Design a protein with these regions (language model features):
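Substrate-recognition/cap regions that form aromatic- and gly/pro-loop-enriched pockets
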Residues: 341-430
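Active-site metal-coordination/substrate-binding segment of hydrolases
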Residues: 65-163, 189, 203, 325-342, ...
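Acidic, glycine-rich active-site loops and adjacent beta-strand->loop/helix elements
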Residues: 77-79, 140-148, 170-173, 212, ...
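Zn-dependent metallopeptidase/amidohydrolase metal-coordination segment
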Residues: 12-13, 336, 343-358, 422-477
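His/Asp/Glu-rich mid-to-C-terminal helical/loop segments that flank catalytic regions of hydrolases
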Residues: 158, 224-241, 270-273, 318-325, ...
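Acidic/His- and Gly-rich active-site-bordering loop/insert found
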Residues: 3-103
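Midchain, well-structured core segments that form catalytic/ion-binding scaffolds
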Residues: 23, 103-106, 146-147, 153-365
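Active-site-adjacent substrate-binding region
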Residues: 219, 226-228, 232-249, 401-444
Length: 485
């Protein structure tokens, strides 16, 4: 049995442990939905699944608290399925194996799922508790947040009654988030007719791995390497100098994760193999030098593979490579009025080329709607010039901060009373569901907070143990001090 069961507060960690025993990668919500629904009904609470697949559980106010504003406790049930290249794990079937490393809880070779499993676990602890004081509560556990916030988008007006929403999906304890970035998925596609490799050519598969990856919003400001952007530098030079031709490319697998790995199959004249291998080694050394202060050692390797039946036609190949090379990636602009806060960014997240089809997916973020439009139009122009069809989907506005929020003032006072310091009040460069839910329920007073997590969306994801108690104690105190209606 996992040692996390011995951690405090036990009522939170026991529920988180239960969540690690239920496969819940984005897109596969059946088991976790059934589990949460059974949990709520087992407590004798009104529990149901709405049309969008969200689980909603209602808990009445405790005696004497009926005159308090209703609170919606919100988290998402899915987790990002990322694993190390050498880890054997089927996220649809296998359980998450946790372990304790000093003050951190980690998973063995996979994402931990603390994003947002610890938020869900805290909600479960509150629903189960019989000794807490609180007003009317509604738990809203949304589906498929990580792949497009589909549960939040599908929420119908009138489903919930609360006036305050506490989103438990932030990742730095001691910080209260009052605003977030909006986003847009940009997808460029192209179909082509493959051509046969030249006679006498050989095929080489190059693989780039070992990058840190991470959350494409929270960690985009750190300048971490993007596997697709590194690989295109090599491929472009191989085409220009060694007559290489592109047969296929696979890089990244999640729209909101900085790609950690990418590989491509290229064909070259046999006599250029030695020079190509030299370029691989040169690029490996160069990338490690450029990112020595940021990345763990980057691995770039090459191996002979069977010659593919087809490859990308030369003109289309050159246009694709130029577009990938030119594509904006990383921070575009900081918020001028908020120090050290990213306003606008993009993540060249997923590239799939081969078999007569090319698809490139980018997630653009901005807390400014006008800058989001500027960035997405720039990306559209970049890939349109390469002859690709570009679609914009999944767009959502940011959450505009309200510094006069009643729940913000109450929580700031409560935090200082509990811990002796003021909490930091921030805007986050990530797509919290608050923006979407707030548009569906106008006037909702919202705050996002949570325990400290690091490297979410990557196998390095970890949760800082002492902050989980502080987070839960603060949540309980907030519920006890909910403003009057």
């Amino acid at each position: 049995m996992s040692t996390i069961l011995s951690l405090a507060p036990q009522n939170v960690w026991k529920h988180f442990y239960s969540l690690t025993q239920i496969p819940r990668p984005s897109g596969h919500m059946e088991k976790i939905t059934e589990f949460l629904l059974g949990f709520g009904k087992g407590l004798g609470l009104e529990s149901f699944v709405d049309e969008a697949g969200n689980v909603i559980i209602r808990k009445p106010a405790t005696p004497g608290m009926e005159n308090r504003k209703g609170v919606i406790l919100q988290a998402h049930m899915d987790m990002v399925p990322q694993k190390n290249n050498d880890t054997v794990h089927d996220f649809e079937k296998d359980l998450i194996e946790t372990y304790i490393d000093g003050d951190w809880v980690k998973a063995k070779g996979t994402t931990l799922g603390a994003d947002n499993g610890l938020g869900v676990a805290a909600i479960m602890a509150v629903l189960e508790a019989k000794d807490l004081k609180h007003g009317p509560l509604e738990a809203l556990v949304t589906k498929d947040e990580e792949t497009g916030m589909y549960g939040a988008f599908g929420l119908k007006p009138g489903t919930l009654n609360g006036e305050i929403l506490l989103n438990l999906d932030s990742e730095d304890e001691g910080e209260l988030y009052i605003g977030c970035a909006g986003g847009m998925d940009v997808t460029a596609t192209l179909e082509y007719k493959e051509v046969a490799p030249e006679a006498g050519d050989i095929a080489v598969k190059v693989t780039l791995k070992g990058l840190r990856g991470g959350h494409s919003g929270l960690e985009i400001n750190e300048g971490r390497a993007n596997a697709n952007k590194l690989l295109v530098r090599f491929v472009r030079e191989a085409v220009a100098s060694y007559e290489a031709r592109l047969a296929s490319w696979e890089g990244g697998n999640m729209r909101n994760a900085i790609p950690r790995e990418a590989h491509a199959v290229i064909t070259i004249p046999a006599e250029n193999e030695e020079e190509l291998l030299g370029l691989v080694k040169y690029c490996e050394n160069l990338f490690n030098e450029e990112y020595s202060a940021i990345e763990t050692p980057i691995s770039f390797t090459a191996e002979r593979v069977e010659l593919p039946a087809g490859e990308v036609p030369e003109e289309i190949q050159d246009n694709l490579i130029d577009a990938i090379f030119a594509c904006q990636n990383g921070v575009t602009r900081m918020i001028p009025t908020v120090p050290d806060t990213v306003e606008t960014s993009s993540n060249l997240a997923i590239i799939t080329i081969g078999g007569g089809k090319a698809a490139i997916k980018i997630l653009a973020r901005s807390s400014s709607d006008s800058m989001k439009e500027y960035l997405t139009t720039s990306l559209e122009s970049c890939f349109s010039m390469a002859g690709m069809k570009v679609e914009m989907t999944g767009g959502y506005s940011g959450w505009q901060p309200d510094v006069n929020s009643p729940i913000l003032h109450a929580m700031k006072a409560s935090y200082k009373q509990q811990f002796g310091v003021e909490p930091a009040v921030k805007v986050i460069h990530a797509g919290l569901e608050c923006g979407i839910i707030g548009a569906i329920i106008p006037g909702l007073d919202m705050i996002s907070f949570g325990p400290t997590l690091r490297s979410p969306h990557s196998p390095d994801e970890r949760a800082l143990i002492p902050t989980v108690r502080k987070f839960y104690d603060f949540l309980v105190a907030t519920l006890e001090q909910t403003p009057l209606k």
